[in-house]
Structures are given as C-alpha cells and as structure tokens.
Amino acid sequence: MPQTPPFSAMFDSSGYNRNLYQSAEDSCGGLYYHDNNLLSGSLEALIQHLVPNVDYYPDRTYIFTFLLSSRLFMHPYELMAKVCHLCVEHQRLSDPDSDKNQMRKIAPKVLQLLTEWTETFPYDFRDERMMRNLKDLAHRIASGEETYRKNVQQMMQCLIRKLAALSQYEEVLAKISSTSTDRLTVLKTKPQSIQRDIITVCNDPYTLAQQLTHIELERLNYIGPEEFVQAFVQKDPLDNDKSCYSERKKTRNLEAYVEWFNRLSYLVATEICMPVKKKHRARMIEYFIDVARECFNIGNFNSLMAIISGMNMSPVSRLKKTWAKVKTAKFDILEHQMDPSSNFYNYRTALRGAAQRSLTAHSSREKIVIPFFSLLIKDIYFLNEGCANRLPNGHVNFEKFWELAKQVSEFMTWKQVECPFERDRKILQYLLTVPVFSEDALYLASYESEGPENHIEKDRWKSLRSSLLGRV
C-alpha cells in the first residue's frame, strides 16, 4: 500500500505545487483553473474531484486541503456519505461484465483515500455516522480480494489506536483539571504542602526549558488539523436557520493548549510573587529570564511568550524594588524579539529562521519549532474568514483554501517532531499540577511584598485582604 509522504513535501514555497492539475479533470464542469492552478469550483464539483476513479487519483495536497476546509460548508459525515455514494456509482456505471475487474482497479485508490483521511483527520471518526460510512465502504473493498482485506484491517486498527490514545490523553487532562486548586486556598488550609518553589524542584533553567518543551510538544501532537477550522465555524452556511456549532465544535485539544499557555503565565507570576524576601524574588526573575532565553534557543516560542507574559503581568511589573536588583539586559533582548509592533515582525523573522533550521536539521533538537500559538490562531482566523466567503458566482474560493492548508500543514510538520530531551517526571508533575495564584491573589501577594503606592492601590489592597484573607 502506498505510504503518504511527510507534510513538508506537500506544499512548495508559493503555497502549493503548481503542476498538479494537468489531468482529465481540467475540462470538468464546475472547476475553474488558471495556469493549471485550481482557483475555485462549485462544492459539488470539488467533491467529485476528491473521489478517485479507474483513471484518476487526486493529489495528496488537494485531499488534505479539501478535507480540511470543506467543513466550513458541510459536516465531515455529509462529505463521507457523498464520497461513499460516488464510489458506489463509479462501480455501478462500469460495464457489468467487467464489474469485478473495475472494482479491482478502483479499490486500492478508494482505500488509499480512506487511509489518508483516517491518518490525517482521525478525530472525524469519533462521529458514529462517519465510522458507519467508513465501515460500509471498507466492507465493499474488503469483499474483493484477500490483499484488500488485510489493508482494510490495518487501516481500521491504526484508526482505533489513534482514537484510543486521544481518549486516554483527554482523561489525563480531565484528571489534571479536576485536581487543580487555587494556591491561596491551599496555603490557607495546608500551608505545609506548598513549601517548595520551582528552583528547589529544578535549579537548572536549561533543564526546565527542556521539560517545558516536552509539555508543549505533547499537547501540540494531540491537536487535530481540523480544530483550526472548527474553532471558527459558527453555523452551517447552507442552513441559516439552524445553528450546528455545538455539534461541530470539537476543539478540546486546541483549547487545552491555550489553557496551558495561561497556566504557565500564571505559574511564572506566582513563583515571582511568592517569596517574602526581595533578593529571592529577584533571583526568581533572573531564573525565568534564563529559562525564557533557552526556550528561544530551542525554538520553543510558545513557552517563551508565556514566560514573558507572566513577567509582564501587573502584579509582577509593579515590583519596582525587586526589578531594581535584576540584571535586565537579557530580558530586554527577549522582549525585543517578541515585540508585537509591526505585526510581530521580529518574532516572525525568528520563526522563519527556526523553520528553515528545521528543514535542514541533522538532529531532533534542530527540528523543534513551537510557534507562539495565540498568534498562529489569529493568523488562521483571518484565513478562515476568506475561505468561508463564497465568490459572486457561488463558487468556493479554493485559492483561499490553499493558503489555509499551507499554514496548517506547516504546523502539522512541527507537531510531529519527537522531543529529544530526557523526561523528568518530578519536574513535569510540578509544572502541570502545582497550584497557582488567581489574578486577585497575585495582586494581594504583590502588595504584601511591596506596599501600595497610591490611593487606588491602597483601596484595592484593603478590599483583597478583606475578601481573600478575611482581614481588615
């Protein structure tokens, strides 16, 4: 059975392979080409272009692009039903005398399409309707020859393994979430249980950066490409009266990753605001600056930005006496790299450098590219907007589909990198489960460390002491 190539090979620098579409489909009604590039088409024609026949198999770039973006216009199970129908029609329309021969020719192509779908978008098949259609079509193929039976079995086993791994991962996330508590609550009830800080758990900033990279890559790995589209699907564009967002919004892994970013920011702020002594707070700031710098060197831009965000939170940034004891030159450089001006120009330049390094990498470490995720989401949001708008003639704007697919396929390449660093369970456990302060608790800790400087801060301090500590 043909193996699918890596995602990095799917798109050239211009966004897609420009010589893929010189096929019999060029004259197909409902598709519009320019210089052999597919620019637009009716939804029905695009679906037909996805389905193989005896003389044709769609390019993998097209398969990925259409399976990714078509969900802006229809449910995946609706697309699967249409694909099944067209495959059966192709078989029926063939000469009855050569029916078995035709099936023998088309079966491996249909099986390859199903394999690509189940490998790249396995989460689609958590829907029972999808799985039912898949099994029906797979049964048709398997009833032919022994070879196909084995390949169908292999495809189904691989899919079931992926879905089982996802369920297991979600259970772990749910367990972590259910046991998470506010640090102030724990301090008031069991103060002896939080006597450690991050430096006592891991005194080496380089090791901490590596463990953060473990968490980032694990969480990235479970994000399905379709989540980038489904996150922005509000309702079915073909049915203006009925919202289907609740059914289609399957973006748990993407949301869990965004929550991780927020947790890391609050963890950094908590660790800085906790120490009673000024020199210990200054030491903690310098420690996180070194962690952030190593994250930058690794190519872990998401942890880097989360650390900078935590250090820039008001409860931390207002600690002027603490910051006065910190050597900030390294921090200034990192802030400059992640400066949001000119649409994050400096960061985007650094990201391109890391992506280029990844392409020519000689080691797993050089392959690591972990983008600043919130910005990636923002970029993809605007691409989704363009994809969802049909052209005046009712055609789907496939040129926009290409742009979206290129961005997501690059992400797919990055998320498949294996983390080369040794895991430290003790450090990972601390990073994922140690209680952190809420925003109010951070302000209270900050005011307790360095007193209020004006009437507004004094009033807030009194209010927080009263509400959080029951003191006046």
Curated annotation (Swiss-Prot):
GO molecular function annotation: guanyl-nucleotide exchange factor activity
Cellular component annotations (GO), alphabetically ordered: early endosome; late endosome; midbody; plasma membrane
Gene3D superfamilies hit by this protein: Ras guanine-nucleotide exchange factors catalytic domain (1.10.840.10), Son of sevenless (SoS) protein Chain: S domain 1 (1.20.870.10)
GO biological-process terms attached to the record: Ras protein signal transduction
UniProt domain Ras-GEF: residue ranges: 204-452
Residues in N-terminal Ras-GEF domain copies: 34-164
Cellular location(s): Early endosome; Late endosome; Midbody
Keywords: Endosome, Guanine-nucleotide releasing factor
InterPro entries, A to Z: Ras-like_GEF, Ras-like_Gua-exchang_fac_N, Ras_G-nucl-exch_fac_CS, Ras_GEF_dom_sf, RASGEF_cat_dom, RASGEF_cat_dom_sf
Primary site of residence: other
Family annotation (Pfam families): RasGEF, RasGEF_N
Function of the molecule: Guanine nucleotide exchange factor (GEF) with specificity for RAP2A, it doesn't seems to activate other Ras family proteins (in vitro).
Subunit structure as annotated in this protein's UniProt entry: Interacts with CCDC124 during cytokinesis. Interacts with Ras family proteins.
PANTHER family in the cross-refs: GUANINE NUCLEOTIDE EXCHANGE FACTOR, RAS-GEF DOMAIN-CONTAINING FAMILY MEMBER 1B
Protein name: Ras-GEF domain-containing family member 1B
Taxonomic source organism: Pongo abelii
Upper classification of the organism: Eukaryota, Metazoa, Chordata, Craniata, Vertebrata
Gene name of the encoded protein: RASGEF1B
